[in-house]
Design a protein with these regions (language model features):
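Glycine-rich phosphate-binding loop of actin/hexokinase-like ATP-binding domains
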Residues: 71-132, 229
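Short beta-strand-loop/turn "lid" adjacent to the catalytic site in phosphate-handling enzymes
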Residues: 19, 25-31, 43-74, 101, ...
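Glycine-rich phosphate-binding/hydrolytic loop that grips phosphoryl groups
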Residues: 123-127, 230-249
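Adenine-nucleotide phosphate-binding core of ATP-dependent small-molecule kinases
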Residues: 161-195, 234
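Conserved ATP-utilizing enzyme core subdomain
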Residues: 120, 127, 131, 136-171
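Conserved phosphate-binding/catalytic loops in two-lobed NTP-binding clefts
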Residues: 69-73, 220-239
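Glycine-rich phosphate-binding loops at beta-strand->alpha-helix junctions
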Residues: 57, 194, 199-222, 234
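Short glycine-rich, Thr/Ser-proximal phosphate-binding strand/loop in the N-terminal lobe
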Residues: 3-41, 109-117
Length: 249
């Protein structure tokens, strides 16, 4: 039998299909202005016995499709535990929220903290800052690694930070140096979340921002040890949902 998990995120939708608890298919698309239409396209031709949804759009998905839902916290804990069984702390930074999750020795959630009230420290923040500097998201992390000076960014508010970036550019500061400062400000915020949930190694980094090489390098410095990133860090929630769909049916 095949089971599926779908993560309806603010920016992207991920689908994972399992057979005998092995990943047989991964699909991804943009959420767009109509995430349910996008989800329908993503599911076209996919065979499964049951599907479980997670992410911010999970309850809407449940209204349109025969499914059940699971919180992102639970889904990420299960997905990360499947990929790296020894993981004890998870950091997820997505398009519009970020979360830190502490697990016990059995992989159960014991504490978590979530920022979903503003864009500060999220993928949306980085996207806006990258645009302000004339970079796309892929360039933003790569170019920041080439910086020669670390510039302090005083505000994490997206509106004020964008204004600050504009001022720094007008003052003649190098774009790479500004990019490094912005990436570091995100890591500083994330490290604070990790510490508040009682940071314990090993640490697993998930979500779209985990593809940013500069963020990963700075996070390892902040944690003081290696962090683990899966080759497709955005599919962890969908994987967890698929595993739970199989477990509960």
């Amino acid at each position: 039998m095949q089971y599926a998990g779908i993560d309806i995120g603010s920016r992207t939708i991920e689908l994972v299909v399992l057979r005998k608890n092995e990943i047989i298919e991964i699909r991804q698309t943009d959420s767009s202005f109509d995430p349910m239409a996008q989800a329908k396209k993503l599911l076209k031709g996919v065979e499964y016995e049951y599907i479980m949804a997670t992410g911010y759009g999970r309850h809407l998905f449940e209204k349109f499709f025969d499914s059940s839902t699971i919180t992102e916290i639970k889904a990420y804990a299960v997905g990360a535990g499947y990929l790296f069984p020894k993981i004890r702390t998870i950091l997820d930074i997505g398009g519009q929220d970020s979360k830190a999750i502490a697990l016990n020795d059995h992989g159960k959630v014991i504490k978590f903290e979530m920022n979903d009230k503003c864009a500060a420290g999220t993928g949306k923040f980085l996207e806006i800052m990258a645009q302000a500097l004339g970079y796309n998201l892929d360039q933003f992390g790569i170019e920041a690694l080439k910086a020669t000076k670390d510039i302090q960014i005083s505000s994490m508010c997206t509106v004020f930070a964008e204004s600050e970036v504009t001022s720094l550019v007008a003052m003649g500061e190098n774009r790479r140096d500004i990019a490094l400062g912005l990436n570091r400000s995100v890591v500083k915020r994330a490290a604070g979340m990790l510490k508040r949930v009682s940071l314990k190694e090993p640490v697993f980094f998930a979500g779209g921002v985990a593809r940013n090489q500069c963020i990963c390098a700075l996070l390892e410095q902040a944690v003081g040890n290696e962090i683990f990133v899966y080759e497709n860090p955005q599919m962890v929630g969908a994987l967890g949902a698929a595993l739970l769909a199989a477990e509960n049916n």
